[in-house]
Amino acid sequence: MKHSATAQPHATPIRRGGIPVPLLALAGGLLASYLPMIMPSLAGISFLGWMLPLAIAVIHLLMYVGRMKFPLMLWAPWIAWVAGYTLLADAHNALQRGIMLLTPLIVAAAFSTLRPTADLLNRIDRWIKIFLWVFLAAAGIATGLLSSGVLYDTTNFAAGSITASLLACWFATRYVLMRQWRDLLLWLIMAAVPVLANTRTGMVAVALTLPLVLAPWSVLRRALLLAALPVVGLALFQTERIQKKMFYSGRGTVDDAMTAVYNMFTGEDHVEADFATSGRSVLNMALRRGLDDAYFFGHGANTTEAISLRITRVAHPHNDWLRLRYEYGLIGTLLFAATMLIQTWHGWRAARRVPSPINIHLYVGVSAFLPMAIFMLSDNVILYVAWFGNLQFALLGLGYAIAHQVRMAEMRMDAS
């Protein structure tokens, strides 16, 4: 995808070799997250996945805050809510968790200060394709496909499925805007990643990225694809590998699975012992029992960690919505959900005013809120900022910078 300049190609601030440093930091963070899967000896650098983009974004933003185009004020109530809870928190690691929740917003603000040139946009498009190969190599090793030639029944690539959903949003949007079959093929490859990784929520989240993409696309095509997905899903459900993942006995029906999932997420009834929940149902019930004790305002930042460690020996409950509800209360959860919806609407409106294909960054950013909301039901996507949030909000921030540049160019044309 070759971009043409939409305004004068001003030099981008804080640069090294013509590349904005926030972009280098984001790329470094992605590599720090995925290279250890390919080369385990690099496991010690994984913490840079979220810290490097954050540190550079803060420095960059302090220097160029006057150029910020990202609508940070939309998120101001949520930022204040998290900051207040973090300052008052008694739980261990509350400060780190609070910072991680807000990191994507800082990254978005920093990227929105950049002056997008055609060279920069083409470079980002090219780098995403390069990262795709790193990602696929990590996926191949983590799932056993490249390391042993046989797919593992269980994998440690749940976070990879989260990244796959964001890449799927990129290629889905690119396909819808550009009509290139290569992008559709790459989307199909992304849709296959959670199948290979055997991550149940990931299969649903990634599959929905194309039919529910927020870029303009035929309603008929969306409907046909949505109609085909249950057929594909049913076929996958019957495979031995997924049956083993779903049921301890290795065999169950769709009705068994749907009933168990509904009961696990709503807490209305017990979950059948044969349904494999990876400990989620027990932890979810423990957290739900405490919701009424702090119904509106929650128990405080990161108070779920101690409960999760006691029950599952894992630091985070694999349900971000329940986590928010327990820690930040009903008001905090509704505040986050409402802000996410407002940001989606605001970004979608901005994307409609930008010519294609340079509106791809905004469309991808807002389309990614759907898989994010789905993953929040069974994972920690709001904390896995290195795997999802940083890149999503970087694209949003850059999209707003492009929208501002287009608007300024139109104003100059009207004035002349």
Regions found by a protein language model. Give the residues of each.
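Alpha-helical transmembrane segments of multi-pass inner-membrane proteins
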Residues: 116-147, 154-217
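A membrane-periplasm/extracellular boundary helix in multi-pass inner-membrane enzymes
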Residues: 196, 217-271, 288-293
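Transmembrane alpha-helices of multi-pass inner-membrane enzymes
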Residues: 364-375, 380-416
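Hydrophobic transmembrane alpha-helices and their immediate junctions
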Residues: 327-373, 409
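Transmembrane signal-anchor hairpin modules in multi-pass inner-membrane enzymes, especially those
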Residues: 1-84, 113-122, 126, 174-181, ...
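Long extracytoplasmic/lumenal interhelical loops at the membrane interface
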Residues: 270-328, 348-352
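Aromatic-anchored transmembrane helix interface
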Residues: 49-53, 72-114, 127-132, 157-162
